[in-house]
Amino acid sequence: MDKTQSSQGKCPVMHGANSAVASNNMDWWPKALNLDILHQHDKKTDPMDPKFNYREAFNSLDLAAVKRDLNALMTDSQDWWPADWGHYGGLMIRMAWHSAGTYRVADGRGGAGTGNQRFAPLNSWPDNANLDKARRLLWPIKKKYGNKLSWADLMILAGNVAYESMGLKTYGFAGGREDIWHPEKDIYWGSEKQWLAPTENPNSRYSGERDLENPLAAVMMGLIYVNPEGVDGKPDPLRTAQDVRVTFARMAMNDEETVALTAGGHTVGKCHGNGKAQDLGPEPEGEDLEAQGLGWLNKKGPGIGANAVTSGLEGAWTTYPTQWDNGYFHLLLNYDWELKKSPAGASQWEPINIKEEDKVVSVGDPNRKFNPIMTDADMAMKMDPEYRKISEKFYQDPAYFSEVFARAWFKLTHRDLGPKSRYLGPEVPNEDLLWQDPIPSVDYRLDASEIVDLKAKLLASGLSVSELVATAWDSARTFRGSDFRGGANGARIRLAPQKDWQANEPERLQKVLKVLTELQASLSKKVSIADLIVLGGAAAIEKAAHEAGVKVTVPFIPGRGDATQEMTDVESFAVLEPLHDAYRNWQKKDYVVQPEEMMLDRTQLMGLTAHEMTVLVGGMRVLGTNYGGTRHGVFTDKVGVLTNDFFVNLTDMAYNWKPAGSNLYQIVERKTGAVKWTASRVDLVFGSNSILRAYAEMYAQDDAKEKFVHDFVAAWTKVMNADRFDLA
C-alpha cells in the first residue's frame, strides 16, 4: 500500500488548534493559576467597529417603534412554535425572567446585563428549555433594529412589553445593556457534574443542615431558582419555602418582593409537560449541526403547542393566563390542593372540587377545560406563615399587588445595570431608589491651577504617602464590574457600614477622614470628600514617582459626589465588604481558596487585566500600603518611593524562598543565609506563575523604570475612575 492509499480516511486537519482533541495546560496542571478570567471579552472577539458606542446607538433608537413591533409579535403566532392561546407573553416573560434571574448579590455576577442567555451553559440549562424558541421569535426584531438594540436589552424589553400587552402598568424600562460575544469565564455556577444533581450527590452545593454554598443562589445546577417539584424533586411546600427565601434573598429580594415576583410571574403563561421528556432531543449545545442552535426537539412528533414539553409540569396557574389580574391568589387561597402527576410524570398541585368557571381553557381545544396547577414553590406562598400573610394582603388589595410587583420586576430586571446614571431611554423612572445606590450630583468645577493647589495642600496636611494612597484605594476597590456597584464615587467609605469594615482599618481611616474633612472646611471653594480622597492618592503617587526620578501627572477629573447615610442601604452594602485584598496584602482569615485565586477574582470584578494587576501589586508594595503596615512583600529599602524594586528583587537569583508558616515565606540571601524579606503567596505568585513572571521580568528590566511608573498610573487611574459613568 502506498503512502497516498494509507492516508485515505485519516483526518486532514492538524489538531494543534482543536481544543476538543488536544489537552490544555489546565488538564496537565489543574492546580495552576488560570488567568483566563482576566483576558475575556477583548476586542479580538468583538466584531463591532472600534468607534462603536452602544449608548449613542441606543439613544438614536425609536423605542416606541420597537415596542409597537413587540406588541404585534405577541399575538402573531407562528406555526413552527405556536403561541399558547395565541399570545407569546408568557414565553417572553419567562425568557426575560430567566435572563435576569441568574443575578446573585454576593458577587454581582449573573443577571441580564450581557445577553449571556444566548451562550453556553445558560442556553442549554434544563430550566431554560425552549427559551431558544423565544429568542428565535425575537430575531426579526433584532435583525430590523440591528446594533441600536442589544440582545440583552431586547430580551428584557420583550418581557416588559409582554406584561404591558396583558394589562400590567410597568414601572419603567432602561436600556444600556451591552452584549458579550462569548460565554463568561468568571462566573462560578457550581461544581456539580450533572444537571439537577440532588443534594446528596458528590460536589453538592449544600453542606450542614442545608447551607447553600456562596455565592450561589439557585438550588441545583441548571436551575434559575428552586426546584418546582420540591426540594430534590420531593414535594414539601414548607421545605421549599426555606429554599425560596434563601434563593431570593441572594438575589437581593425581601419576602414581599419574593411573593410578588412568584405570583406575578405565574399570573400569566403556563407550564408544559403534555408528553414524555424522554422523547426530547438534546439541549442546543448538544444538538446536531442541522438543528441550527435549537434544542429540546421532539424526536417522535411535532411536540409543539398543546403537546410541548418543557419543565414537565403541565398547566396554567390562573384561569385567564393571557391577562394581568388577581386570579393567582383567588385560586391559591380559596381552594384546597392535592398532589398529582403531570402527563410527563412531574409532581404538581391541583385544586380539589374546583368550580367549572375557574378552570383553564385548553391551549389546543377551546371547548375543553383543565385544572389550574401550582408548583411546590407556589404552595409555599400559602403554607409558609410569613408568605401567607403577604399573599392575603395582595389578594385583598389587587392594586397594591400590581404596584409592588411592577417595582419588584423593575428591580429584578435592572439590578445588575448599575446606578441610574447608566440608564438609557425615555422610560427611565424619575424616582431615585435606594437599591440603585444614589449619589448626589455636584455643582462645582475645578480648573488646573486649583487642582495643583489642592494637591499641595493635601501633601502638606501631615498625611503620609501610604495613608493617602491606601485610603484612596480602599475607597475605590469596592467597585464591581459585574453589577457596577461600589467605587470611590459617593465616598461611602466614611459611612456605615464601610467606615467600620476591618479591611478599611477604621482607626487609620478616621484619622485620614478627619484631616480631609478639616481641609474641606477650610477651602474657599466647594469640593467633595470623594474627590479629595481620590486627589490625595494622586498627589501622593506623583510625589512618590518624583522621588523615584520620574515626573508624572496622575489624571484627575473632579465630579464625584458625597452620598449620605440616608442614601445608603447598610444591609445591601454589606456584601461589598472585602474579606481579602491582595493589593494591600491582607485577608481576614484563612480560606479554602488560595489567596492568589481570590486575588484573581477581585481583579476580575474590578475590570483589570493580568498585567495591570501585576503593576499595581508591585507599586502598592513599595508605596508601603500593606494592611497594618506589615512588611510582607515590601522588597525595597526606599518605602514610599515608586520604584520597580519589587520586581527587581523578586526576580533576583541572589535570593532563595522558604516557607515560614501559613501563607508566609522568608526571602533568604543564598550566600549568607540571612533573612532579607518576608512575603505572602500573593507576592511570590508573580515569580512562580510563568505568565505573571513574564510580566514581572519585564517590569524588572533596567529600561522599565519609567514604563513601570506610567503603567502603574494608568492602572491606578482606571480603578479610581471605574465608577465614573458620567465620563463614558
Swiss-Prot record:
The molecular function terms in GO held by this entry are: catalase activity; heme binding; metal ion binding
**Similarity section:** Belongs to the peroxidase family. Peroxidase/catalase subfamily.
- What remark does the entry make about the cofactor? Binds 1 heme b (iron(II)-protoporphyrin IX) group per dimer.
The signal peptide, as residue positions, is 1-22
Catalysed reaction equations from the record: H2O2 + AH2 = A + 2 H2O; 2 H2O2 = O2 + 2 H2O
Q: What class of enzyme is it?
A: oxidoreductase
Site residues, Transition state stabilizer: R94
Which superkingdom does the taxonomy of this entry point to?
Answer: Bacteria
Q: Which cofactor does it need?
A: heme b
PTM remark: Formation of the three residue Trp-Tyr-Met cross-link is important for the catalase, but not the peroxidase activity of the enzyme.
What cellular component terms from Gene Ontology apply here? cytosol
Source organism per UniProt: Shewanella sp. (strain MR-4)
Database matches in CDD domains = catalase_peroxidase_1 (cd00649), catalase_peroxidase_2 (cd08200)
Q: What is its EC number?
A: 1.11.1.21
Where are the residues linked by the Tryptophyl-tyrosyl-methioninium (Trp-Tyr) (with M-251) cross-link? W97-Y225
Q: Which InterPro entries match?
A: Catalase_peroxidase, Haem_peroxidase, Haem_peroxidase_sf, Peroxidases_AS
Q: How the protein assembles, per its UniProt entry?
A: Homodimer or homotetramer.
Identify this protein by name. Answer: Catalase-peroxidase 1
Task: Identify the keywords attached in UniProt to this record, alphabetized.
Answer: Heme, Hydrogen peroxide, Iron, Metal-binding, Oxidoreductase, Peroxidase, Signal
Catalytic residue list: H98 (proton acceptor)
Tryptophyl-tyrosyl-methioninium (Tyr-Met) (with W-97), cross-linked positions:
Y225-M251
- The encoding gene is katG1
Q: Which GO terms describe its biological process?
A: cellular response to hydrogen peroxide; hydrogen peroxide catabolic process
Question: Record-annotated residues binding heme b?
Answer: H266
PANTHER family from the UniProt entry: CATALASE-PEROXIDASE, HYDROPEROXIDASE I, BIFUNCTIONAL CATALASE-PEROXIDASE
Q: What does this protein do?
A: Bifunctional enzyme with both catalase and broad-spectrum peroxidase activity.
Task: Return the SUPFAM superfamilies for the record.
Answer: Heme-dependent peroxidases
